A protein has these predicted regions:
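Short beta-strand segments
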Residues: 81, 113, 140-146, 171, ...
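Short, well-ordered amphipathic alpha-helical segments that serve as non-catalytic structural scaffolds
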Residues: 53-69, 206-223, 276-280
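Conserved beta-strand elements of the Class I
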Residues: 9, 76-79, 139-141, 231, ...
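Conserved beta-ketoacyl condensing-enzyme motif
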Residues: 51-115, 225-243, 249
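Condensing-enzyme catalytic core mediating Claisen C-C bond formation in acyl metabolism
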Residues: 1-51, 154-218, 297, 308-310
Length: 310
């Protein structure tokens, strides 16, 4: 009997030009000590996309539609999640105009904000709620993206290195490769006023680990499983330290944490989890019934999304 749970399919992504971290020196963003620090944390490259954000998105959307065999007219809802420091009315209008140029017409269009780089899980959660509704759309298009707008890809204290990128997928009640079992998120508003500096790192870490554990426990309970049932963890590629922390908080064996894309791409704004799923399944598919978990962490937000291979 086919499961009634909403399913994810046709994940496509774009990361622009992949450049070695040494290029940051010529760009005036880093010195040699910073390069060595990034390398020690497992980061070798970063991604730079000179296109406007809406062009980054439409290239992914075109790939998702082609792979799924769907047309814009088949999409009943669009869920947009951005992980950008600057997103304004001009950007919003450019994105909507780009959708119209692709053939999208009157439909439900939602934007997910205040989730930072955990936005993909929130967007998947909203999309699954939409298509699960008795009067909801048959197919929802999810598009996640982020792009450097500040001229500095380094997080404070060089804790991570940000890359440009976009990723899209279809969420529908019909066919798909991964079904969405559950989702959860937590935001700690008390951290918003804290400066991201070394003296405050312990506060961020304590709160972050606590929130990560809670959201993982929540989705395990929703799926009536335990951490032992997880075949893979797809996490925020902040650094090797991020991956170790997220893996520990999820309760999953360290070897199950997907790490291959950290050296390849660094931290692609908001997109790491879905990009990892795509690449891992192309390289080595999961067995039917196996569970995977998408776990994301930003300084004051933690989220998790539990999925199962169809």
């Amino acid at each position: 009997v086919e499961s009634a749970l909403p399913k994810v399919s046709s994940i496509c992504y774009s990361v622009g030009e992949i450049r070695p971290i040494e290029a940051l020196v010529a760009l005036g963003m880093a010195d040699q000590n910073t390069i060595e620090s990034l390398a020690a944390r497992g980061i070798q490259n970063f991604c730079e996309d000179c296109r406007p954000a809406h062009d980054m998105c439409t290239s992914c959307i075109a790939g998702t539609l082609a792979e799924s065999g769907l047309q814009p007219a088949d999409i009943g809802a669009v869920v947009l999640g951005h992980s950008m420091a600057k997103w304004d009315l001009k950007e919003e209008q450019a994105f909507l105009s780009a959708l119209a140029a692709m053939g999208f017409s009157r439909s439900q269009i939602f934007g997910v904000s205040m989730q930072a780089c955990t936005v993909a899980n929130a967007a998947l959660d909203l999309a699954r709620l939409l298509v699960s509704s008795t009067s909801g759309p048959k197919n929802a298009l999810v598009i996640i993206f982020g792009k450097d707008s500040e001229g500095n890809r380094l997080a404070p204290q060089a804790a991570t290195l940000f890359s440009d990128g976009a990723v899209s997928c279809i969420v529908s009640p019909g066919s798909g490769t991964l079904e969405i079992v559950g989702a959860a998120s937590l935001t700690d508003p008390a951290l918003a006023a804290l400066e991201w500096s070394e003296p405050n790192f312990p506060k961020y870490l304590v709160s972050g680990v606590m929130s990560l554990r809670k959201v993982c426990e929540s989705v395990y309970a929703q799926g009536r499983i335990s951490a032992r049932d997880i075949a893979a963890v797809f996490a925020t590629n902040g650094s090797s330290i991020y991956l170790q922390m997220i893996g520990s908080a999820s309760g999953v064996a360290d070897k199950q944490v997907y790490r291959e894309n950290l050296p390849r791409y660094a931290h692609v704004y908001g997109c790491d989890n879905l990009i990892g799923m795509r690449d891992r399944m192309l390289a080595q598919d999961f067995k039917s019934g196996e569970y995977v978990i998408s776990v994301a962490w930003a300084p004051n937000v933690a989220s998790a999304c539990l999925l199962r291979r169809v």
